[in-house]
């Protein structure tokens, strides 16, 4: 047993942080397509409650960088769309 080892504890925070970053990057990349399709369907369902729309004229894009993920949804609503009461 080395007595210096008792007083010189290793710092594990950098290794834990790196493992967490790898795990988060993996989960973001694997769950991205499922999340986008789920969000698209739920958002379209909410919009369809209030306005008639063509589901084919909806574009969904997701942009990812190191710190932020951005979901952009373009919905084309005709000028003569019937507005429904909620």
Curated annotation (Swiss-Prot):
Signal peptide: none annotated. One of its GO terms (biological process) is regulation of division septum assembly. SUPFAM superfamilies: Cell division protein MinE topological specificity domain. It holds the Pfam family MinE. Keywords: Cell cycle, Cell division, Plasmid. Belongs to the MinE family. Prevents the cell division inhibition by proteins MinC and MinD at internal division sites while permitting inhibition at polar sites. This ensures cell division at the proper site by restricting the formation of a division septum at the midpoint of the long axis of the cell. This is Cell division topological specificity factor.
């Amino acid at each position: 047993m080395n007595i210096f080892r008792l007083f010189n504890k290793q710092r594990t925070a950098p290794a834990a942080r790196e493992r967490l970053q790898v795990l988060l990057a993996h989960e973001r990349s694997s769950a991205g397509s499922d999340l986008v399709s789920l969000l698209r369907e739920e958002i379209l369902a909410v919009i369809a409650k209030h306005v008639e729309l063509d589901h084919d004229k909806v574009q969904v894009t997701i942009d990812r960088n190191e710190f932020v993920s951005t979901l952009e949804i373009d919905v084309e609503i005709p000028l003569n769309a019937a507005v429904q009461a909620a």
